[in-house]
C-alpha cells in the first residue's frame, strides 16, 4: 500500500493529465529498441551537421566529447545551445565534459592551436556505422596535425616562410653529428702558422716523455717549458744540430708551400698601427724639433727643460708645421750662438723675456745710428736748426739719455752680429726722417 501511494504522488507531480495515456512509463511498455534507434538518429544528425558547418568550429567541437542523453526523458538537454557554440565547444562553461586528451593539449590560457585536433577524429566512441579503417585513418591524421599552424608549410599563418615542423627526435642525430665535428665553430682557413724553430722541435719531441715522468703530471705548462729549456741548454752542439736541421727543412717546406707568406700577416695589431707609425717616422729637418731627451740624452737630465722633467710637452720642440724655436745661448741648450731671424717663430714661454730683450737692444741700436746720421747732416748744412735731439747733455731728452746709454752697450757688444733685415729697416727709417728734417 505504501509503494502504491508513493507512485501515485510522483504521478501527480510530474505527469500532465492529457499525456497520461501516451506515457510509456505509466503504461509499462518497454522501449529499448526505440532508445537504440534514437541514439543512431542522433549520431547521424551530428555527422550531417558537421559536414555542412565551418571546419574551424568543428575543430573546437572535436576536442571535447559529446554528451549522450542520460535517458529518453531528457532528449533536449543540450539543444538549448546554438549549433555553432555548443556546450561541448566551450571549455569555460563545460570543463567537466572535456576529454583528457584535449586537456593535455590545452594551454594555461584555455586556448590551443586551431589544428591541434583533426575535425575527422571524434573524441567520443564511434558509432557502429563506421568501421575500424576509418578510425585508423583519423588517428593517423590526428598525429600528423599535432604540429602548430605557424610551422606548417602550406598554412596561411606561415607568412615568414618558416621550415616545416620537425619532431625533436628527428633532430637529435644532427646535434650529435655537430658535437662530434667539433662544436660548430668554423676555424679560420687563412691563418698560416709560422714554421717551427729548433727549440720548438725539441719541445715537440720531448714534452710527452717529460709528462710521463713521475711528478710532472700536476705541473703547469710554464713549469714544463722551464724544465724543457734547461734540458735544451744542457744539450751539446752535436745534439742540437739535429733539431736545427729539422727546423731548416721545415722552413724550406713552408716557403715552397706559401711563397708569399710573411709572419707579419698573423698580427692584426701591427696592421692597424702602420699608418700612425708612418706619420711619426717623419725625419726632423733640424735639431730644434727634437726634445730634450733626444738633444742631451737620458743621462743629462739636469739640462732638460722643466716640462720634459715632468714628462710633459717639451719646451723647445717645435710644431712640424711651423719654424724652429729661438735657441737659448745663455744656458747652453741652443745649437748655435746667434739669434734666429725675424721670420722664425719665437718660443712662447721661457724665451719670451730673451726675445723682448733682443728687440729692445735692436731698437736702441737703430736709434743710435739715426742720431749719428742726423748730427752729421745738420753740421754740414748752412742753416742750423736746433733740435731737441741735438741739445746738450744737461738738457737732453730721455731719448738722448737712452741713446747714450745704448752706445756704451753697443761698444761692449761689438762682436754681436746684426740681422741684415733690421739694417735695411733702419736705413729706410733713417732716410725718411732725414727728408722730413731737411
Curated annotation (Swiss-Prot):
DNA-binding region ranges: 192-262
Reported consequences of knocking out the gene: Knockout specifically targeted at seam cells causes an increase in seam cell number, but this is caused by a combination of anterior daughter cells adopting the seam fate, and abnormal differentiation of posterior seam cells. RNAi-mediated knockdown also increases the number of seam cells as a result of anterior daughter cells failing to differentiate and adopting the seam fate. RNAi-mediated knockdown in L1 larvae causes a severe loss of M lineage-derived coelomocytes and sex myoblasts.
Effect in UniProt of substituting residue 120 to A: Abolishes nuclear asymmetry, defective in nuclear export and loss of par-5 interaction
GO cellular component, one term: chromatin
Region span, Involved in nuclear asymmetry: 88-130
Task performed by this protein: Transcription factor. Part of the Wnt signaling asymmetry pathway. Binds to the consensus sequence, 5'-(C/T)TTTG(A/T)(A/T)(G/C)-3'. Activates or represses target gene expression, depending on upstream Wnt signals and interactions with transcription co-regulators, such as beta-catenin/sys-1 or zinc finger transcription factor ref-2. Essential for the specification of the mesodermal and endodermal cell fates in early embryos. Required in many asymmetrical cell divisions in the early embryo and during larval development.
Protein name: Protein pop-1
Gene: pop-1
